[in-house]
């Protein structure tokens, strides 16, 4: 065994001072000194459990000892009588075995393949033991789940990712999918449960047993987000539901993930074979499938953007030539040819790599280089994680941990280690690029005239610019030259490395060539240079624009069309990634797909990292806003569709925020106990105003109120028990916090909850009964007007139905026409006095007479006035469809309804476009005179004369 390096020998003295007397007095072996110096995790563990060190010294870890894990664990669990005892024994067993694995790994007593096998088998042993113990306990409590024939139904667990492939790393979370075979009910229990309820409850308990931190730590962080429909899907699915999902909705990334899926525990039973046979056609196509290459290329692009987004450097997993690229290379062949070559259907990487070489799909040399690189990287990764039992793939920056890794990897020092690492990663990147890299051959650099280069390099005198700027006016020419000079001065104030300068010198002549060809060159250049100033120190973004000419062209056209987009890109340069694919840039997400897209986006973010979750929500929203605005500018989205997309996007955000807040609150307090025997959360979010009316603009805030149906006597069922209604209040406060917290990516939405009963003085969250009572007995007419444009945007079906019934009841109350007319008109006059245009000779599109608010008041008045006679008027919450209903129900002539609809959409369209230009919502007084006259006439007819 290699002696400790000089820095580690010095550190050993610090270790000695930490060791308790019994250990310090012992004559520790050289092996023990080495491992304790290398790993703080082992050090902490043996200080807490000195007997483990004695065991290690007397019974050195062996390569095949994984075969005994199940028996050892069964012995440890033999006297466990309750869930708390189960949790303690599982945690202690995991820590004890992990210390043995760390010992063997640090001292290289076994091969790296053996380490991966031991780590994976340990996880499987713990998962299966916990499942089996809980299954027996749940059967005693609720009866045994059976199918229609009375046959007991098991819970099958799919281990995904590295767990499934038998290649788990030292400190890893585990990705699981739960399934049960057939529908039915429990038998032999105190009361009957259907199988879905049984397995959902059992699954929740299993996750808690493995995942919940206690004084003994946790067993594994459990991630269930790879299951069908992710967090919004059922925790456990029947085989039939799984099959339907993967046949009808399975995505490429799910197919990719399923390659490594492995059934935990007994994998040869009837049900296990049935599940495997069901999934195989989804994963391995019967034909040779070259579409996989583009899918994996896209996924690699996503990972590269993720590396940029999270600022990852020195990452041996996700970086260029890292572990992920080796996995991609192997899985390309599995997914392309696995259906035709059963030998490629292995879950484990190294055996599959051998098959790939044997089939001559890769050269023997390339396959061997990948094998050696993989084992090198996995050993480095596992050693890195075993220092502190910490889930990281980022190389350390401190001298101690660098010295530790260099010693354990058998190098003299850190530079030698990084030199070898670079060589391995370079080999991997070469093979990856040959196989999966962009298939478009690099286009030859456009031959730019020397004048564009000179213009950028400030080598052209003003008189020399005439040939390249001839089409511009003299003032514009001067402005362009000033902008370039100012930009160069700004660069001199910033720290830009040689690579950044090189990229800029390549990019700027191309950019100037494209921008200066435009008539609006000066305006466009001013917007783009403002953006570039923000990203010049981040070379990856400059490279993106330099290497992808199409992205540069999209940037120029969008910045020319909209200063709002230019500002967004300058503020959040991560959005530049969106410019790479025009198919998605000018094609917003389908309105019904925002939730699913957001779910997939959030899969890439650790579930327990609130800061990253908040950033991801904001980044997703900004990317989607960019796409909507791009489609709006391109003319592919009419005004109604723009608002539809903005509204669906907001609803997806609300859904995700409520989900996050709910998970956080339940983790802290447990669930309100009135939910124990029912589906759902007993909670609803009601959207008012533009959100309720499907009429959101680019910068609209959200008018929300929160409802619950929690009884007065309900309590939560967690360790920190609180009153059920207090739980919902804290849930609503948490939701507001998640929306309003300002991160580096800004806030998510401004949320206004003042439309709740009693306004700002009222409770933030209201019971459904109290809301109904308030609307019937206390609400003002303007609050009933607001109810016209209200609808549930998140909530349980029963609460949604309750709200809809209350809304319908309030809106169909008989009202005295003149009184209502007076109250609505007076409220409008108050608003006009307060909000009307303060700009002389300007027309405020929303607030002034003849504007949008007048149309909204007309529709609200007519619904409240006539819904008692025509209840169908309550169906919709948006103005356009309300106007249709008014015509269909003979309240308003069709010609007038259509004219008001045209005026309304025209004015809203103008507001959207003013927002894109970052202009206020008022225009010259001589604009929209026809529309305003029409609205005034309608106002006079309904709210003055009638």
Swiss-Prot record:
It catalyses: [glutamine synthetase]-O(4)-(5'-adenylyl)-L-tyrosine + phosphate = [glutamine synthetase]-L-tyrosine + ADP; [glutamine synthetase]-L-tyrosine + ATP = [glutamine synthetase]-O(4)-(5'-adenylyl)-L-tyrosine + diphosphate. InterPro entries: GlnE, GlnE_rpt_dom, NT_sf, PII_UdlTrfase/GS_AdlTrfase. One of its GO terms (molecular function) is ATP binding. CDD domains: NT_GlnE_GlnD_like. GO terms for cellular component: cytosol. Its EC number is 2.7.7.89, 2.7.7.42. It comes from the Bacteria. Its cofactor is Mg(2+). It is an enzyme of class 2 (transferase). It holds the Pfam family GlnD_UR_UTase. The keyword Flavoprotein does not apply. Residues 1-440 are annotated as: Adenylyl removase. Residues 449-946 are annotated as: Adenylyl transferase. The keyword Nucleotidyltransferase applies. Keywords: ATP-binding, Magnesium, Multifunctional enzyme, Nucleotide-binding, Nucleotidyltransferase, Transferase. One of its GO terms (biological process) is regulation of glutamine family amino acid metabolic process. HAMAP family: GlnE. Belongs to the GlnE family. Involved in the regulation of glutamine synthetase GlnA, a key enzyme in the process to assimilate ammonia. When cellular nitrogen levels are high, the C-terminal adenylyl transferase (AT) inactivates GlnA by covalent transfer of an adenylyl group from ATP to specific tyrosine residue of GlnA, thus reducing its activity. Conversely, when nitrogen levels are low, the N-terminal adenylyl removase (AR) activates GlnA by removing the adenylyl group by phosphorolysis, increasing its activity. This is Bifunctional glutamine synthetase adenylyltransferase/adenylyl-removing enzyme. It comes from Shigella boydii serotype 18 (strain CDC 3083-94 / BS512).
